[in-house]
Regions:
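N-terminal secretory signal peptides and thylakoid transit peptides that target proteins
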Residues: 1-16
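Sec/Tat signal peptide C-region and signal peptidase I cleavage site
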Residues: 25-32
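An acidic, Gly/Ser/Thr/Pro-rich helix-cap/linker signature
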Residues: 33-105, 111-114
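Non-transmembrane alpha-helical segments in soluble domains
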Residues: 43, 168, 226-229, 322
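Surface-exposed patches in mature extracellular/periplasmic domains of secreted proteins
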Residues: 51-60, 120-126, 179-182, 212-213, ...
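Acidic/His-rich structured neighborhood in mature extracellular/periplasmic domains
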Residues: 88-217, 222-224
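Flexible, glycine-rich surface segments
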Residues: 178, 185-190, 195-278
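C-terminal soluble interaction/assembly domains
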Residues: 250-330
Length: 330
C-alpha cells in the first residue's frame, strides 16, 4: 500500500475514502484531447513492457478522468488527529470482536501462513482489520481509472504512472479482471490495500489457483500481508512492542523511534510495563513512543514496530495494528 499521504491521513488505512467512483468526462475539448494523448502514450509504454493489445484496449479505450479522484487527492485535512481520537475510532469493540471471529474461523490457515513466513498472526490480523475491516470495505474506485486520472492530472504524475503501468501488468498476468480491480481513490487495492507496485512485489498465490487474488481469496490476502512484512525485515519470534508507563518527569527528548535503549536502561529512567510491573530482561532494543506527547499513553516499540511502519509510515497505525493483534489473540 505505501503511498505518500498528508498530515493525519498518514494514520488512516488506504480504504478510508471509499466514495463511489463516477466517470467524469473532461470539461472541454482541449482537456479531452490532452487525455487522449496521455492514453496513447500509456499504450505505447505498455506495449514496450509486453502488455497485450487486448488488455490495453479493454483497460484504456473507453477510459475518462474522474474528477472525484482528483478532488479527494487534493483535499487538505482540516485538523490534526490525536492518538486518543484515532484509538477510539480504530480500536472499536466491533473491530476487535470481528477480528476474534476471523482468528477462530481461519485458525488453521493462519497457522499455515505463520509457519510459511514466520510473521505473527496477530499482526497479520491487525493489518487486515485496520485496512479494510477484514475485507468488508475495499474501496469503490476502479484502480485503472484512478491511477490513470492521477497520472494524467500531473501533481504526482511519475508516481501514479508507475502505479498505472503496474496495474496494467496485473491485468495482463490474469490475476484479476478490470471490473473487479477495485480499490481506494489513490489505487490501493483489495483487502490488504496494496498499491499495484506493491502487489507485484509482495502478493502471493497461497491457495494455488494460479492467481494472486487479494480481493476475494483469504489465503492469498493473509499470505500476501505476511510476505510484505517478511520482505520488509520482519524478525521472527519477536514482539512488535508493548504498552508502558513513563513517568511524567521523563525527558521528552529521549522519546521517539530514533532513540533505542535496552529495557534495563528504560527501567532506570522509570519506565514500567503498562500494568505497572517491572520491565522484563530482554536483549531487544526499544524506543519509547509517546503518541500524544508527555502525560499521555506510552509504548515501548521493538524493531518489528518499524517493519509495520513500512506498510504504513505512521506511529498511530503501527501501534493500532499491534494492539488489535494483541487483543484479538488474547
Amino acid at each position: 500500500m505505501c503511498i505518500p499521504r498528508r498530515s493525519f491521513l498518514s494514520a488512516l488505512p488506504a480504504a478510508a475514502c471509499l466514495g463511489a467512483a463516477g466517470v467524469v468526462f473532461p470539461s472541454n475539448q482541449a482537456e479531452a484531447q490532452d487525455f487522449r494523448g496521455f492514453i496513447a502514450g500509456v499504450k505505447a509504454e505498455g506495449r514496450r513492457a509486453g502488455i497485450s493489445d487486448t488488455i490495453l484496449a479493454q483497460a484504456l479505450n473507453t477510459l475518462s478522468p474522474n474528477t472525484r479522484v482528483i478532488e479527494l487527492d487534493r483535499k487538505q485535512p482540516e485538523f490534526t488527529m490525536t492518538w486518543e481520537r484515532y484509538r477510539s475510532t480504530r480500536l472499536s469493540e466491533k473491530r476487535i470482536a470481528a477480528g476474534r471471529e476471523q482468528a477462530a474461523r481461519n485458525a488453521q490457515l493462519l497457522m499455515q501462513v505463520e509457519n510459511a513466513y514466520g510473521v505473527d498472526r496477530g499482526v497479520i490480523l491487525g493489518i487486515w482489520g485496520l485496512e479494510t475491516n477484514y475485507g468488508a470495505f475495499q474501496g469503490g474506485f476502479n484502480v485503472i481509472e484512478a491511477t490513470a486520472t492521477l497520472a494524467w492530472e500531473g501533481r504526482r504524475a511519475s508516481f501514479f504512472r508507475a502505479e498505472l503501468m503496474a496495474a496494467l501488468k496485473i491485468l495482463n498476468h490474469g490475476d484479476i479482471t478490470m471490473p473487479r480491480m477495485q480499490g481506494s481513490y489513490a489505487g490501493a487495492m483489495g483487502q490488504p490495500q496494496f498499491m499495484p507496485t506493491s502487489f507485484n512485489r509482495y502478493a502471493v498465490d497461497f491457495d494455488g489457483d494460479g492467481r494472486r487474488n487479494i480481493w476475494d481469496s483469504v489465503p492469498d490476502v493473509l499470505a500476501s500481508i505476511a510476505n510484505y512484512l517478511l520482505k520488509s525485515g520482519w524478525h521472527q519470534g519477536q514482539p512488535w512492542g508493548t504498552q508502558a508507563i513513563a513517568p511524567a518527569t521523563i525527558d521528552p527528548s529521549v522519546a521517539g523511534r530514533e532513540n533505542r535503549l535496552s529495557l534495563a536502561e528504560w527501567a532506570r529512567l522509570g519506565v514500567t510495563l503498562g500494568n505497572g510491573q517491572r520491565l522484563p530482561a530482554s536483549p531487544l532494543p526499544a524506543s519509547l513512543i509517546l503518541p500524544d506527547g508527555p502525560g499521555g499513553e506510552a509504548f515501548l516499540a521493538y524493531p518489528n514496530f518499524n517493519v509495520i511502519r513500512r506498510y504504513n509510515p505512521s506511529d498511530f497505525y503501527a501501534i493500532a495494528v499491534g494492539m488489535i493483534g494483541d487483543m484479538v489473540m488474547a
